[in-house]
A protein has these predicted regions:
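Alpha-helix N-cap/helix-initiation sites
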Residues: 12, 70, 173-177, 280-281
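A generic structural motif
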Residues: 8-9, 170-172, 297-304
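Helical/strand "switch-coupling" subdomains that flank nucleotide/phosphate-binding cores, especially
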Residues: 84-88, 103-230
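Contiguous, well-ordered alpha-helical segments that form the cores/surfaces of helical PPI scaffolds
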Residues: 20, 181-188, 289-292
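Short amphipathic alpha-helical interface segments
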Residues: 174-182, 284-288, 594
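Active-site-adjacent structural elements in folded domains
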Residues: 145-152, 276-279, 285
Length: 595
């Protein structure tokens, strides 16, 4: 099941209902076929599948302008069944968590729900003392740039649900509290400040307390060195290692990059632990029902890196949908013996997909510029226009009338032309971490923090011992993994799975932007029907023969057109239908007769 739609259209709620239904159905089948024994175990598996939602929502959902509980990531959930139809487990894949929301929120938006749950006192005794956080969200910069309270959300109650979900899923006390402590650590990192010295590339710590709290939570004794590693990281110049002074802005940028990376790694760790609890090794997995919950096509006033990833994903999904319709149409026409020149509708979107995927396409250029140390937004823009403008029919100059006056280019997608702004794409595609700080974190006493950064190479000289005996090429290949390359690999894996299944498409629509029941904004709905591919599907159907009627029904309905001729056909329904259709002028190319 592919569930798509705009933010606030109901994707997450529909996904939860679908998952709950299949989980309960699988448990009922277990009880029917097994009788009384191990009912408790199977009910627990059902509960675990359902209870992944509070954790994923706490760490992956946030308030946006349009939706108080918006999923800021995509997910593909598999519900497994054995040969008897019994529930046999589950597995969750996640896509493209919005890391930038960790450190920045627009006005009237909010950070991830878990941040605001942790400042609530009561549901988890002693939590504030353990994580060293106050109960005032305004004490923390990373969570107070937008709104801090949402009328429709009771953060205290939600913390209780999150805590219970950890227990239901079988997280140990250590795992649960390590997750809370690491989340709090990220908030404390946001409070670290620096004072600029007289010289341009030099600064010093301002208030030592946030750094001390951060070090306490991650198990680092030398908090002065922790600050010092931001202020004067070790870098390689030629063949020599030197300490390079940083100005205050550089230090703050390094902290923000560390916070985003740490939160993303924490989120992926939580998903891995959820998957661990959903596996029942005693059950043989034969079939699965997959539910894909992912953002639909987005055309905003300001479109940036997140939108290009989401829209590329939707181009691929729409191509899959179009090709699927083509295959179904072809099968139907072959079954009915209808002669028709077949067109693979999936090829209609090929120009845009080629723009993204070809060897010197947009994604390849983004990868190249991301990994080149001296690249800038301007050099990236210049290279895109040099290689794509005028050479691809769908890569365009920014379109007039855009409210984003700083847009750099436009792409003609199936849902419409979208203007894109290139600002910060290189930064968003890879968070360049301060390797000196990461090396210190990898030696911390907090086992979870060490685990989260286990695959980060750190300083090359620190890794030299581990990499001894390996070829330099192999050792260096793992240094950087960009968001776009990881997302592209995930997307290819997802499409391979979808191509091996029998897909069903669910399109969710926002009826109006006022959250008012019973009100339908026709212009808004039409825009969404365009963006989620419904109109594209109608266009495809109209290129074939979209209306299918059985002969008996057609004869009874239209006999009035040629009553004598139809009655002369007797019981031959196909002949009667042909008589009626041939009497209509200039319509012979618009109908066919099946078996």
């Amino acid at each position: 099941m592919l569930i798509t739609g705009e933010s606030g259209a109901g994707k997450t709620e529909n996904t939860k209902k679908v998952i709950t239904y299949f989980a309960i159905l699988g448990a009922v089948e277990s009880k029917k076929k097994d009788g009384d024994p191990p009912e408790e175990k199977k009910a627990n598996l059902e509960d675990r599948i359902v209870n992944t939602n509070p954790i994923l929502e706490s760490y992956g959902n946030a308030k946006t302008i349009r939706n108080d509980n918006s999923s800021r990531f995509g997910k593909f959930i598999r519900i497994y069944f054995n040969q008897m139809g019994k529930l046999a487990g589950g597995f969750i894949d996640v896509y493209l968590l919005e890391k930038s929301r960790v450190t920045y929120q627009q006005p009237n938006e909010r950070g991830y729900h878990i941040f605001f749950q942790l400042v609530e006192e009561g549901p988890v005794p002693g939590l504030q003392e353990m994580i060293r956080m106050s109960t005032d969200p305004y004490d923390y910069f990373f969570m107070s740039q937008g709104k801090v309270k949402v009328d429709s959300i009771d953060d205290q109650e939600e913390l209780e649900f999150t805590d219970q979900a950890f227990d239901t899923l079988g997280f140990s006390e250590t795992e649960k509290f390590d997750a809370f402590k690491t989340t709090a650590l990220i908030m404390h990192l946001g409070e670290m400040t620096f004072k600029q010295k007289g010289r341009e590339e030099s600064c010093e710590m301002d208030d030592p307390l946030p750094g001390q709290k951060s070090c306490e939570l991650c198990g680092i004794e030398n908090w002065q060195l922790f600050y010092g590693n931001f202020i004067r990281p070790k870098i390689k110049v030629g063949t020599e290692w030197v300490y390079k002074g940083q100005n205050a802005d550089n230090c703050l940028n390094a902290i923000a990059a560390l916070a985003r990376s740490m939160y993303n790694r924490l989120f992926m760790w939580l998903v891995d632990l959820c998957n661990r609890t959903l596996i029942d090794p005693t059950m043989k997995k034969v079939n699965f029902i997959g539910v894909l919950d992912i953002a639909g096509f987005e055309i905003f006033e300001f479109n940036t890196f997140e939108q290009i990833c989401i829209n590329f994903c939707n181009e691929k999904l729409q191509q899959f949908f179009n090709h699927h319709m083509f295959v179904l149409e072809q099968e139907e026409y072959v079954r009915e013996g209808i002669e028709w020149e077949m067109v693979d509708f999936g090829m209609d979107l090929e120009a845009t997909i080629q723009l993204m995927e070809k060897p010197m396409g947009l994604l390849a250029i983004l990868e190249e510029e991301t990994l080149f140390p001296k690249s800038t937004d301007k050099s990236f823009e210049d290279k895109l226009k040099e290689n794509l403008l005028g050479k691809s029919p769908v890569f365009l100059k920014k379109q007039p009338g855009s409210k984003d006056k700083s847009a750099h280019f436009a792409i003609a997608h199936y849902a419409g032309i979208v203007n894109y702004n290139l600002s910060d794409w290189l930064t968003k595609n890879i968070d360049r971490l301060n390797d000196t700080v990461v090396d210190q974190l990898k030696k911390a006493d907090n086992a979870l923090v060490v685990y989260l950064f286990r695959d980060h190479p750190g300083q090359p000289e620190e890794e030299a011992k581990k990499e001894k005996g390996k070829k330099g090429k192999d050792a260096g290949a793992k240094q950087f993994k960009t968001v776009s390359s990881a997302f592209r690999a995930q997307l290819e894996s997802l499409l391979a799975t979808l191509n091996a299944t029998d897909p069903h498409f669910i399109r969710c629509l926002v009826p109006n932007n006022h959250k008012t029941p019973g009100l339908l904004d026709s212009a808004l709905v039409m825009h969404q029907l365009t963006c989620n591919g419904v109109l594209e599907g109608i266009r495809i159907c109209r290129r074939g023969f979209p209306n299918r009627t059985v002969y008996l029904e057609f004869k009874h309905r239209f006999v009035i057109i040629k009553p004598k001729e139809v009655h002369a056909c007797g019981t031959d329904l196909k002949a009667a239908t042909k008589v009626i259709l041939e009497s209509i002028e200039d319509a012979n190319d618009r109908w066919r007769l099946g078996h």
